[in-house]
Amino acid sequence: MNPEIFAKELAKYGFELNEKQKKQFATYYDKLVEFNKKVNLTRITDKNEVYLKHFFDSITPLLEFPDLFKGEKTLCDVGAGAGFPSLPIKILCPNLSITIVDSLGKRLKFLDELVNDLGLDKVTLVHSRAEDAGQNKDLREKFDLVTGRAVARMSVLSEYCLPLAKVGGYLVALKGPKAQDELAEAKHAIDVLGGKVEDVKELTLPDTDDDRTLIVVEKIKATPKKYPRQAGTPNKKPL
């Protein structure tokens, strides 16, 4: 998917990229490849692959559930790595306020430089484990949307993310193919943490056989204070 096809695909969903946005994605790609030589951010560096498997893939929640992103929403991206999915979404939705939580300082250095180079405002970077962020009173139950992509299986991801969503907010999980088994396994965790599965959308990336699953979980009640448990526990002993 070259930049021109990327723009055409987005236009099918009513998102017409302006010149500034096209330039932001081009800068994002250049910066990602340049920084990746020093810090391992991604194994995908081919331009067409980055536009498809990072940029377009990150934007799929916005394309499939546009109403979730309307207005002056707050979004927390847990374990964003090289900024996925939140920063591609931010380029298309400048009104979003983004908070990125990541535990690796080197990745945050990249993100800090990237946000500056892209000229993005309302982006906050937090150096923290997800479990600690969920117990931080400045972050807990503060966000309209919480995203997670390639972070952990659904039961673990729910414990990382749902404590950060406000009641009435949503967790949007970007998953690979056949996520239904993972979701069934996570049903208890989602319930305990105050969530309810609102929607599951299966899709295929354009002109590929790459299947993806988007899982939307609504936060319907407050998360019990004991969750998330201390760092490392959710992954070792999933709910």
From Swiss-Prot:
Which keywords fit this entry according to its UniProt record? Answer: Cytoplasm, Methyltransferase, rRNA processing, S-adenosyl-L-methionine, Transferase
Q: Which GO terms describe its cellular component?
A: cytosol
List of residues binding S-adenosyl-L-methionine: 79, 84, 130-131, 149
EC assignment: the record states 2.1.1.-
**Pfam family of the protein (one):** GidB
Q: Cross-referenced InterPro entries, in alphabetical order?
A: rRNA_ssu_MeTfrase_G (IPR003682), SAM-dependent_MTases_sf (IPR029063)
- Which Gene3D superfamilies does the protein's record reference? Vaccinia Virus protein VP39 (3.40.50.150)
Localization (cell): Cytoplasm
* CDD domains membership: AdoMet_MTases
Report which superkingdom the organism of origin falls in.
Bacteria
Could you cite one Gene Ontology molecular function of this protein?
rRNA (guanine-N7-)-methyltransferase activity
PANTHER family from the xrefs? S-ADENOSYL-L-METHIONINE-DEPENDENT METHYLTRANSFERASES SUPERFAMILY PROTEIN
Please describe what this protein does: Specifically methylates the N7 position of a guanine in 16S rRNA.
Which family does this protein fall into? Belongs to the methyltransferase superfamily. RNA methyltransferase RsmG family.
Quote the NCBIfam families the UniProt record gives. Answer: rsmG_gidB (TIGR00138)
The protein's name in its UniProt record? Ribosomal RNA small subunit methyltransferase G
As recorded in Swiss-Prot or TrEMBL, the protein's gene is named rsmG
